[in-house]
Amino acid sequence: MIQQIEITLTPKSRGFHLVTGELMRQLPKLPKTGVINIFCKHTSCGLSINENADPDVRTDMETIFNRLVPENRPEYEHTLEGADDMPAHAKSTLSGVSLTIPITDGRLNMGIWQGIYLCEYRNHGGARKLVVTIIGE
């Protein structure tokens, strides 16, 4: 069985947001065994799996990414869409825009402390569209 759907995440402020619940509420029933691929259709945000318990992790991730790719650098040429745009593209490349997660017994087989993050790199990114492909039996 192969299923593919497109879902939309609600707009988020800039930062790292735990979206596991929002994502799961929009998914069909998962197969007993398989894999799920989640692909983000945007170039200024990303997806990641990281700690789901301590919100300080999300704050620290934002700090780390902002230090790695600062805004307002004079060497940036792509600046028409604002100071946060070119850094958002670079950060998206660093985090990636897709995740593949195993499905076991009809559930995402992630660690107890793992959650799915939307990494929003724009100040006002808007709703984000994800293509979800489920392969399983």
Language-model segments: residues:
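Active-site histidine-anchored catalytic micro-motif
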Residues: 1-137
